[in-house]
């Protein structure tokens, strides 16, 4: 179960140095935080020279604290004309500051005007204080800060990246011994790239021994300020110390990808790849984007809450928060999707659930800006209509028009996107280092080293996968005219959903009809939608007094789902190679599986495409580029398209 996140408490020494009462230690040297960061961590890792002329450089830090090391590294990157194309800075933090305390801490320590401006950008982007991985982008996506909130002892083993430099900057070993244990250094060794370097202000004997045991060489150099010595070194193991090598970029001759399908999954992939400079050819069987399930007039977005903070809750939390940041970035760049005001209300299934979830929110200490428990009276005031029970409010949840989001993402891709409509992909074939896509007539359409299958129900068939089965779920939604009933002030979900559109129409839905191919609107489905919503919002039954079901309009679309209700996101397995080696792979883990170089998928999003799509696209782009993953590895493995193949291999049923 996830541990509650406990924010840092900011205090100051008499000399004005930021100080942690919890660890009885200072956040940086009294001589100066900026100078310490430059001397210890940049010069200690031979930066900026080591990142020059490189496409990608990754720093991993233990202990983000005030963010001084990140700010100084960012400033050095900005000042270097030979800087790397993309700088990833990944940092763990068990006790992050609130935004207000972060501002106070940096204001006390940052006198340099240029770095103060960067500190302001950091504060403006500061994430909600909830456990997990938070990816923030600066410099138009060329500087990426990935914050991992939680105990580093637990979170470091969940990261997947190739580090070029380590900043070992927790509180001193005698004040915070848990961050300097052999287990922590073993986790770092698992992520170290070739010739990765490290620097740390300490020269403790225990730290030296732990570094050596993990495969690092060290040397003692002059310390900063009043410290006599510090350690620098590199990863140079004398023998193999890990089962899997950290990730590398996909070896391609050209940065060109084909994206099949232009719904939420495909358009998000287009945006994330073109943001990295990839050229993308999109193939769509319809005449425009977002014509299948992504074509609904609006969709709600919110995380899933559970009493044990399940895998599903953790993934939807990450996806929800990442999507909000990405949509804001699109708007900042002038590509504005249509979305409603912030706020979404979820009504509990019964009073027992309402009480249980209120207790859960308190025990996890979820911040009120993320989710807040509400009584029935609170809910009625928020919704501006009668409700059956209390529940919980997502202040930043809401609704968005999926088609407008898809259009905005394609606009953001600019000239790097070539769009082809009315093309139905039928199969792919490998020729040397390229994948060729063929249409239904057997004609070759386009080739590229990378293909992303974002075509829902057709993905497994076109990709030739046998262990990625999905099912179709018919969903009919109902549009209630403005004169049919009073609309709630904001989206309300629970037993179905009621969503107030901008024109006074209320969108309700949606049915869940497994393996039902009927595309026609059905009166019975309209009745089902209204009755279900009326269990949350009793006044919705008034719609029957104004309009007969046969007079109502709506839309039918088909969700694509898996048996575990999680999407398929990531690299495809080479199923034939895996089955040939089934005996060796009976105890395999996801990283053991052979992969089909260049084939990736983003499909089976069910009813949560708005939450899954942006994060899934970022995960795939990171896998392709060899960048740090934007979520914990166990969460990515829960989404792995090869998970059902892996299950069959473990059970001895793969053939």
Swiss-Prot record:
Organism: Paraburkholderia phymatum (strain DSM 17167 / CIP 108236 / LMG 21445 / STM815) (Burkholderia phymatum)
InterPro entries: FAD-dep_OxRdtase (IPR006076), FAD/NAD-bd_sf (IPR036188), MnmC-like_methylTransf (IPR008471), SAM-dependent_MTases_sf (IPR029063), tRNA_MAMT_biosynth_bifunc_MnmC (IPR023032), tRNA_MNMC2 (IPR047785), tRNA_S-uridine_synth_MnmC_C (IPR017610)
Cytoplasm as UniProt keyword: yes
One BP term from GO: tRNA wobble uridine modification
Reaction(s) catalysed by this chain's protein: 5-aminomethyl-2-thiouridine(34) in tRNA + S-adenosyl-L-methionine = 5-methylaminomethyl-2-thiouridine(34) in tRNA + S-adenosyl-L-homocysteine + H(+)
The family this protein is said to belong to: In the N-terminal section; belongs to the methyltransferase superfamily. tRNA (mnm(5)s(2)U34)-methyltransferase family. In the C-terminal section; belongs to the DAO family.
Protein name in the entry: tRNA 5-methylaminomethyl-2-thiouridine biosynthesis bifunctional protein MnmC
Keywords: Cytoplasm, FAD, Flavoprotein, Methyltransferase, Multifunctional enzyme, Oxidoreductase, S-adenosyl-L-methionine, Transferase, tRNA processing
Chain positions covered by the region annotation FAD-dependent cmnm(5)s(2)U34 oxidoreductase: 260-655
Principal location listed in the UniProt entry: cytoplasm
């Amino acid at each position: 179960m996830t541990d509650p996140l406990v924010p840092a408490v900011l205090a100051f020494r008499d000399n004005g140095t930021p100080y942690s009462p919890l660890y009885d230690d200072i956040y940086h040297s009294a001589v100066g935080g900026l100078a310490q960061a430059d001397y210890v961590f940049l010069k200690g890792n031979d930066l900026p020279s080591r990142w020059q002329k490189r496409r990608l450089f990754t720093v991993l830090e233990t202990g983000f604290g005030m963010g001084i090391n990140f700010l100084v590294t960012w400033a050095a990157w900005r000042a270097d004309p030979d800087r790397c194309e993309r700088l990833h800075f990944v940092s763990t933090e068990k006790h992050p500051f609130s935004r207000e305390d972060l501002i106070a801490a940096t204001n006390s320590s940052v006198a340099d005007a240029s770095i103060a401006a960067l500190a302001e950008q950091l504060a403006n982007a500061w994430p909600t204080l909830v456990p997990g991985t938070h990816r923030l982008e600066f410099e138009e996506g060329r500087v990426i800060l990935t914050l991992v909130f939680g105990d580093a002892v637990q979170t470091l083993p969940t990261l997947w990246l190739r580090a070029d430099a380590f900043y070992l900057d927790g509180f001193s070993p005698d004040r915070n011994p848990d961050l300097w244990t052999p287990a922590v250094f073993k986790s770092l060794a698992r992520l170290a790239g070739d010739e990765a370097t490290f620097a740390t202000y300490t020269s403790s004997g225990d730290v030296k021994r732990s570094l050596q045991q993990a495969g690092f060489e060290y040397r003692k150099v002059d310390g900063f300020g009043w410290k006599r010595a510090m350690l620098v070194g590199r990863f140079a193991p004398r023998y193999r110390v890990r089962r899997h090598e950290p990730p590398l970029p996909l070896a391609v001759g050209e940065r060109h990808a084909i994206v099949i399908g232009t719904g939420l999954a495909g358009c998000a992939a287009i945006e994330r790849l073109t943001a990295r400079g990839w050229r993308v050819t999109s193939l769509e069987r319809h005449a425009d984007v977002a014509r299948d399930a992504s074509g609904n007039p609006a969709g709600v977005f919110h995380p899933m809450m559970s009493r044990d903070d399940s895998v599903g809750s953790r993934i939807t939390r990450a996806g929800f928060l990442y999507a909000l940041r990405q949509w804001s970035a699109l708007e900042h760049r002038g590509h504005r999707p249509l979305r409603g005001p912030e706020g979404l209300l979820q009504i509990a299934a019964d009073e027992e659930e309402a009480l249980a979830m209120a207790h859960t929110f308190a025990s996890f200490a979820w911040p009120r800006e993320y989710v807040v428990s509400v009584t029935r009276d609170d809910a009625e005031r928020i919704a501006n209509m009668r409700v059956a029970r209390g529940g919980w409010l997502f202040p930043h949840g809401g609704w968005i028009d999926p088609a407008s989001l898809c259009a905005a993402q394609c606009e953001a891709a600019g000239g790097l996107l070539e769009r082809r409509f009315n093309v139905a992909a039928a199969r792919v074939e490998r020729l040397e280092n390229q994948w060729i896509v063929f249409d239904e007539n057997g004609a070759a359409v386009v080739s590229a080293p990378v293909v992303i299958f974002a075509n829902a129900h057709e993905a497994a068939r076109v990709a030739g996968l046998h262990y990625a089965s999905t099912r179709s779920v018919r969903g009919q939604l109902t549009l209630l005219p403005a004169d049919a009933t009073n609309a709630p002030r904001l989206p309300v979900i629970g037993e179905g959903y009621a969503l107030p559109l901008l024109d006074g129409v209320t969108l309700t839905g949606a049915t869940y009809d497994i393996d039902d191919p009927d595309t026609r609107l059905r009166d019975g489905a309209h009745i089902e939608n209204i009755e279900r919503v009326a269990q949350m919002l009793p006044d919705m039954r008034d719609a029957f007094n104004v309009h007969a079901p046969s007079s109502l309009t709506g839309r039918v679309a088909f969700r694509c789902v898996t048996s575990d209700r999680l999407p398929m996101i990531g690299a495809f397995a080479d199923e034939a190679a895996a089955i040939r080696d089934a005996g060796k792979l009976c105890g395999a883990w996801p990283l053991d599986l052979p992969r089909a170089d260049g084939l990736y998928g983003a499909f089976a999003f069910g009813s949560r495409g708005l939450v899954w799509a942006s994060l899934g696209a970022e995960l795939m782009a990171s896998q392709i580029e060899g960048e740090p993953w934007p979520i914990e590895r166990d969460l990515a493995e829960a989404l792995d398209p090869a998970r059902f193949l892996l299950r069959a291999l473990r059970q001895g049923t793969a053939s």
